[in-house]
């Protein structure tokens, strides 16, 4: 089995079993062996799942991959909330999502950043606004 297929299998198994530790392990393997575009659909699903604690790692992976297919998931994830991140008044996860959108740098990604810049959370809105001048 190729590295790519092994990573896909690990991520699928982690998601099927809803095993948070397995998500962490699979992401570690993915980063070690190299992220590939074939991971994007699974990463998009996982970034929206609420049963694990690796959302920031997934945002970083999607930022590195810069795949336009991840735009919707990243924009939705930027507005999501997770109990384990309640301590973070700076919304670091949302910030990572806005960086990923900016790095994708398509018209659709910029449009989603504009939408986020109008959201009701002033911190997230500021992150999105800040990304626009850097990429537009």
Stretches found by the model and what they are:
Residues 1, 12-35, 45-49, 55-68, ...:
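Structural detector for internal amphipathic alpha-helices that build alpha-solenoid repeat scaffolds
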Residues 70-81, 122-123:
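Amphipathic alpha-helical segments within extended alpha-helical solenoids and repeat-rich scaffolds
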């Amino acid at each position: 089995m190729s590295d790519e297929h092994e990573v896909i299998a690990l991520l699928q198994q982690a998601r099927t079993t809803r095993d948070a530790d397995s998500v962490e392990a699979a992401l570690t393997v993915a980063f070690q062996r190299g992220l590939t575009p074939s991971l994007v659909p699974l990463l998009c699903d996982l970034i929206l799942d609420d049963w694990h604690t690796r959302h920031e790692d997934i945002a970083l992976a999607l930022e590195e991959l810069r795949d336009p297919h991840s735009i919707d998931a990243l924009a939705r994830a930027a507005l999501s909330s997770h109990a384990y991140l309640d301590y973070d008044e700076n919304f670091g996860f949302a910030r990572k999502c806005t960086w990923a959108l900016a790095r994708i740098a398509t018209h659709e990604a910029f449009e989603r950043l504009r939408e986020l810049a109008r959201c009701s959370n002033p911190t997230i809105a500021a992150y999105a606004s800040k990304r626009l001048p850097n990429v537009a």
